[in-house]
Amino acid sequence: MRYKIIVWLGSDFTQYLVSYFLQNSIDCELYAIADTTSKIKPFFENQTLVNFKKIWFFQDRISAQNQTPDIKYLENFEKIFEINIWKLAINERIFYRFNDYHKFSRNEILSIEEQSCKLFEEILNEVKPDFFITKETAFHHLELFYQMCLKNQIQVLMINQPNLGKSAMVTNKCRIPDFIKNYESTKSKNRDFNELRTFLEKLESGGSIQNYLARHGGTKYDSFSAASKFLKSDNSTEKTNYPYYGRTKLDVVKNEFLSSQNRRKRKSFVDKTLQKNVDLKTHFVYFPLSVDMERNLLIGAPMYTNQIEILRHIVKSLPINYQLFVKENPGQSSRDWRSLEEYDEITSIPNLTLMHPSFSSRKLIENSDLVISIGGSSGLEAAFYEKPSIIFSEIGYDVLPSVFRVQNIDELSNTIKIALNTKVYSQDLDRYISLLENEMFSFDSFEFTSDLKDELFLGGNLHDNTISEKQIKKILTKHESLLKKLTDEHIKKINYFSKK
């Protein structure tokens, strides 16, 4: 059977690299949607490494200028696809809260949505794909196309993380194993908690994340080269790509200067103010903060993006003899930390202690009575240390009897009481891990992403950069073994879904 496959091409190039090996491994027609900047676009227009039957350049089809949205069309679209457009749009980091360069109007946002929807409908109607290969859906327009594929029963092949260390899986839904429906029938391997914790320790990604953060931004030479290239460029992307609207050279330089100042001030505040020593023998609930402006919050938990408000709700819901220990996420450094006003707001909440990002998460989990998380890995890690957890998003491990998902904030107080009295059983966790072992594979996504940033984007300092086939060939050779492994995992899922 000849498969029709649409591939989402972005600046990390992972899906493009997989496509290179995939085209020679199965009988398929490859199509692509390229979401790229102006300087990357010529590479995809002229490349000869992957035989794409057709490539649509997303940004070429989208303009927010002087457009009046067709509300009737969008209204009908929502009914057909059962997609809440405003829920996606209001959580788009480019549209609201996190954009320092351009304030999008209602008409601009809805015009972008209308053009995106029409383009995606056109592509799906023309190709009628069997599969869609994508990265995790970090931006709303990719999430939109992803949801449209699910509605049309197109199988999605998404590289994502199973919330367990240096590993990955290719699944239809983000952070949810495809075999999750088999949980009840999956047999435990009879591993006790000590054996399960040994399994976890072998996978732990703490060092990998720290290395990624250390490499973030590259070398001083990378920063200087990126600045020089940017200042000498025509900066055409600022006019053609809506995520870059308002990013004039002067405003970018100003913003970078202010960011560097804020970064130093905030880091100093974090080091001086956030707690590094606490009494772990007291009764406490542990809440690890998620990184703001990330998928985990904006798409994974769209109704729970205000973490400070969540902290207030938790404190209001605690039994009288409990405290809330909150830990800052080390990854927040990549976003220049939080504002001093946000830190003041958090630390002013009574019965709450804000921990320094260097404090051991494992110690906090081990000594807590309950872990509450928006939807990251901490809720799953809690089970390894015999602790119940509460989450706010749909995620694979919520099948565990010791994991409780909040879908109505009014239920939080009662859910906390129930969770605190819930015992964690090793056989429940072992069944879930046994299920995961059938899907996950070894893959350090942080290291791979860092390598691509170093090799293509000057350490991540310049994403609107010129790319050559010579660079891509070098990456294909250097990472051949890893990329073939990723390709094989995609083929496994293609074969699996084809038999259904």
Residue ranges and their predicted role:
Residues 190-247, 268-274, 409-500:
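C-terminal amphipathic helix plus adjacent low-complexity
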Residues 312-356:
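Catalytic donor nucleotide-activated moiety binding site of glycosyltransferases and closely related
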Residues 8-25, 303-318:
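Histidine-anchored nucleotide/phosphate-binding helix
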Residues 1-12, 35-36, 105, 133, ...:
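Nucleotide-activated donor-dependent transferases that construct or modify glycoconjugates
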Residues 12, 134-135, 160, 356-404:
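A donor-sugar binding/catalytic signature common to diverse glycosyltransferases
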Residues 279-315, 322, 328-332:
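Active-site donor-nucleotide binding/catalytic segment of nucleotide-sugar enzymes
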Residues 118-182:
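Conserved nucleotide-sugar donor-interacting segment of glycosyltransferase catalytic cores
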Residues 21-120, 164-267, 488-499:
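Conserved N-terminal ligand/cofactor-binding loop architecture of enzyme catalytic domains
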